[in-house]
């Protein structure tokens, strides 16, 4: 069993819609356990730093403004093949292209307000988790077989 960790963010639109619990339940139902979780209002510097890889892209400024428009839920999810599992549960970045039953299909309204973020690789998951969480803030618990 390949136990991994990945970063998940419930974006401001998810909080506005009141679907935090529904989103976390979807992760848990698929075997991803939140091992660190925090509600936080990102500063502009935090959002710019986190999304620095997109700095040259035309949507960067709007993305940063959206991410600082309200609080977010930052989570570390742990489970078997967590990175891929999280991405499957979230669905395609564009909710219009997302599969039925995915978070983005059910809760997102546009590619800009797509409700959740998830790490796209194990390498990036490690970087993204370290950006928001110290190792002492992340906890594990036993897995049921």
Swiss-Prot record:
It catalyses: a 2'-deoxyribonucleoside 5'-diphosphate + ATP = a 2'-deoxyribonucleoside 5'-triphosphate + ADP; a ribonucleoside 5'-diphosphate + ATP = a ribonucleoside 5'-triphosphate + ADP. PANTHER family: NUCLEOSIDE DIPHOSPHATE KINASE. Transmembrane segments: none annotated. Homotetramer. Major role in the synthesis of nucleoside triphosphates other than ATP. The ATP gamma phosphate is transferred to the NDP beta phosphate via a ping-pong mechanism, using a phosphorylated active-site intermediate. Keywords: ATP-binding, Cytoplasm, Kinase, Magnesium, Metal-binding, Nucleotide metabolism, Nucleotide-binding, Phosphoprotein, Transferase. Its cofactor is Mg(2+). Belongs to the NDK family. One of its GO terms (biological process) is UTP biosynthetic process. Its main location: cytoplasm. ATP binds at residues 11, 59, 87, 93, 104, 114. GO terms for cellular component: cytoplasm. This is Nucleoside diphosphate kinase. SUPFAM superfamilies: Nucleoside diphosphate kinase, NDK. It comes from the Bacteria. It is found in: Cytoplasm. GO terms for molecular function: ATP binding; metal ion binding; nucleoside diphosphate kinase activity. Its EC number is 2.7.4.6. It holds the Pfam family NDK. The active site is at residue 117. The keyword Ribosomal protein does not apply. CDD domains: NDPk_I. The keyword Flavoprotein does not apply. The lineage of its organism: Bacteria, Pseudomonadati, Myxococcota, Myxococcia, Myxococcales. NCBIfam families: PRK00668.1 (NF001908).
């Amino acid at each position: 069993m390949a136990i991994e960790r990945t970063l998940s963010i419930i974006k401001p639109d998810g909080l506005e819609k009141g679907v935090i619990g529904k989103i976390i339940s979807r992760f848990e139902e698929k075997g991803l356990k939140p091992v660190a979780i925090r509600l936080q209002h990102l500063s502009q510097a935090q959002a710019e730093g986190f999304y620095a890889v997109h700095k040259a892209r035309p949507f960067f400024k709007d993305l940063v403004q959206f991410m600082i428009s309200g609080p977010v839920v930052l989570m570390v999810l742990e489970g078997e093949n967590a990175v891929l599992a999280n991405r499957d549960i979230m669905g395609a970045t564009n909710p219009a292209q997302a599969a039925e039953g995915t978070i983005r299909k059910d809760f997102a309204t546009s590619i800009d307000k797509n409700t959740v973020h998830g790490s796209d690789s194990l390498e990036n998951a490690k970087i993204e988790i370290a950006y928001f969480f110290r190792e002492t803030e992340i906890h594990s618990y036993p897995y049921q077989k």
